[in-house]
């Protein structure tokens, strides 16, 4: 009897380990099984026309994604949705009213995106690598790393934009540009031509003596508009806010923002949410016109 009891005791750790492994595997299976649902959820959110409904829904969605990442921390797909979600929530609903909080969300966005990038095999660290080191590292990136490169660069760029007094900002924005340049090389129309919008802001938001290139910025905005058949209002918003303001082109600033405000709500049904957010921000920028010009 004692021998049987000892045998059971010896088996117990193995049984417990098996149960724990099964639980972990089950958690991962559940997460991976929701990936197609997440695709549909994001598509539905992008089509949302009620900004208040979207604002109230997004925090719960983000926490759900982060909960799934606890179950499956190596899930690159979910990492990228977390990055995209935090970026969208910060840009769409937080930045104009609380820049510090938005900055924290962009940082979380960056952390998720960088982890996703490293999980694709690109062991980059944009904040510590020299430009030459980073360029060599991202030069190895292929198509599977495009999304992670894009969101890492985008989130880092927005974090820098809200923390311009940070001494490392100039170095880090060049790191974001190196990553985004690789996105341009691999797939320049990825995420609605987002890389072109990035470089429109990058070259358009600075005076030429500080590295700006307004002609190049205008070309990038033109390409982004063409990719979206002039239906994504965000392109005009960014051109007005950064390039027109930097060039002191009040007429262009007003014309672009007025076009946004007057655009029909059904201009781009697949991207109704971002167009609605863009309209809201355009109204805000128009209130600043007299101060800026």
Q: Predicted segment positions?
A:
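Bacterial N-terminal signal peptides that target proteins for export
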Residues: 2-13
